[in-house]
A protein has these predicted regions:
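Glycine/proline-enriched, intrinsically flexible loops and inter-domain linkers
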Residues: 1-249
Length: 249
């Protein structure tokens, strides 16, 4: 009914049965049958060796930090490409197609309204390869928490996440260790926040010229906004807008 309503092409390719088998037919003749358990609970499980990442024992030399002028540090931070205006990207496509976008790009999460409802969906996709490379366990936690923060910053209640886990060669114990520790971090953060993982994907053997990529788990989360007209923007509304700092810095 949904596909017909929006005039979308579709075809029914099968139906759910209670045979516990995946049955393949062609011209109404059975061409193959596969036990479902072989694709799920009875699928082979790899138990690869992995080692915990040895973190560098680095201590900050405060004497060296004192030599940095606060003016120079501020200019260096503000001139970073990470803080530059992104309009040159977002202005090249129609952000308001079908008028479903509740606010323009630039916020920590995108907001899409639901037809005929006051509700809206917030979406955020996050990753931090450098963080996960430095400390896989904390990096895994941080990505989930960042995704959560991005959703609540626009007024959404986080509902669920999916993931795309991108890593190097898992046959190398140190790479498998990055994978394992990132997963532990993601798991612990999701359990603490009660943030269910509804789907996911793993991509191994990523690298160039025999050099593995940094551990790059990507988290995509959605949240629900009960009334999209009350969603939060990312810009100051007037000169007297308050700035709230949450947590220690």
């Amino acid at each position: 009914k949904i596909f017909e309503k929006w005039d979308l092409d579709f075809v029914i390719i099968g139906k759910t049965t209670d045979t516990n088998k995946l049955t393949l037919k062609f011209d109404n003749k059975v061409k193959g049958e596969i036990p479902i358990n072989a694709l799920a609970s009875q699928a082979p499980i790899y138990d690869r060796k992995w080692i915990k990442k040895k973190l560098p024992d680095k201590k900050i030399d405060l004497k060296k930090l004192k030599k940095i002028k606060i003016e120079d540090a501020l200019i260096k931070v503000l001139s970073s490409a990470n803080h530059s205006n992104k309009n040159w990207i977002t202005s090249q496509y129609d952000q308001m197609v079908m008028c479903d976008t509740a606010q323009k790009s630039g916020a920590d999460a995108a907001i899409i309204r639901i037809h005929g409802k006051e509700k809206a969906i917030a979406v955020s996709v996050d990753s931090s390869a450098n963080y996960c490379k430095a400390h896989p366990l904390t990096g895994g936690k941080q990505i989930v928490c960042e995704n959560w923060r991005n959703l609540i910053s626009v007024g959404a209640k986080p509902v669920a996440i999916t993931n795309c886990l991108n890593f190097g060669n898992p046959e190398k114990p140190e790479i498998m260790g990055e994978f394992a520790e990132c997963l532990i971090g993601i798991k612990e953060a999701c359990e603490f926040l009660k943030y269910p993982v509804v789907s996911g994907n793993v991509s191994f053997y990523n690298g160039t010229n025999k050099k593995n990529i940094a551990p790059t788990p990507v988290i995509g989360g959605i949240g629900l906004i009960s009334k999209f007209k009350k969603s939060f923007g990312h810009q100051f509304q007037d000169d007297n807008s308050a700035i709230l700092l949450i947590g220690k810095t």
